[in-house]
Design a protein with these regions (language model features):
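Short polybasic linear motifs
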Residues: 1
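Acidic/glycine-rich phosphate/pyrophosphate-binding loops and surrounding catalytic core
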Residues: 13-166
């Protein structure tokens, strides 16, 4: 197995191709579970070609994680969506910060938003907690490592979040 550098220095013990397959599977499964054959409210109320935008607004301070994952979700749902970022994975954010704006069809934004919010909240919480442990151990020879004890089905993003946190 190769050690590869992915998504802002994320090192894992699988190939880049295998990691990307895991991320793609997480996204496809989550969208299928959440939306199925479509968000019926959006399909009924929002014209197919209606354009829109959204922003990710920070509600608490900590380490932001999952920006690169969010870009992949948006691209999966609608390849033409555009994301304008103001922070990078691993940056410290505080209440009121705007992490990114996303532009695309309103239906596609709504289709992607629940997965993006859930994943980024979880990844940011893990990254923030990891950073606190890393800071506590600064000056020692101790290193924070992740384990295999992760949530089935989303292991790749949880391990990614640990790496982002430190």
């Amino acid at each position: 197995l190769l050690i590869v550098n992915l998504a802002k220095q994320y090192l894992i013990m699988i190939s880049e191709e295998q990691f990307q397959k895991e991320i793609d599977l997480i996204i496809a499964n989550a969208i299928r579970e959440d939306v199925g054959d479509g968000d019926h409210s959006s399909l009924a109320c929002i014209p197919v070609n209606a354009e829109g935008s959204a922003k990710l607004l920070v509600k608490d301070e900590g380490i932001i994680a999952g920006i690169d994952f969010a870009k992949q979700v948006f691209r999966f749902v609608e390849p033409s969506m555009r994301v304008e970022t103001f922070f990078n994975d691993g940056d410290f954010v505080k209440y009121g910060d705007v992490v990114f704006h996303v532009y695309g069809t309103s239906q596609a934004i709504l289709k992607a938003e629940r997965l993006v919010l859930n994943a980024m909240q979880r990844m940011s919480a893990i990254a923030t907690k990891t950073k606190k442990f890393v800071d506590l151990l600064e000056g020692t020879k101790t290193k924070v490592l992740d384990t295999r004890k992760t949530t089935p089905g989303i292991r790749a993003i949880e391990k990614w979040a640990v790496k982002i946190g430190g």
